């Protein structure tokens, strides 16, 4: 499963995102508002504990998902990847490829 296309609904879109921290590490999360969440990571106590000591963070990847459940499953799958494979995913998205080209990144059994 990949969070590539989302049918039109009244519900807000959910996003899976990856930020690169100041120390070069990657953090993966989910949200309905990426701009707000990046601001929280960079400036407020609402940012993830992991990113608070690694500011500033920069958005390097995002996927749109149908709902929170799908976003959570995709987040889990990405968090299981090695740092090298996460960077491959980020680089592929920079070149215009979507996660659909990386079936090994999808959730097992889906």
Curated annotation (Swiss-Prot):
PANTHER family: UPF0213 PROTEIN YHBQ. Belongs to the UPF0213 family. Residues 12-88 form the GIY-YIG domain. Pfam families: GIY-YIG. SMART domains: GIYc. It comes from the Bacteria. This is UPF0213 protein DP2720. InterPro entries: GIY-YIG_endonuc, GIY-YIG_endonuc_sf, UPF0213_domain.
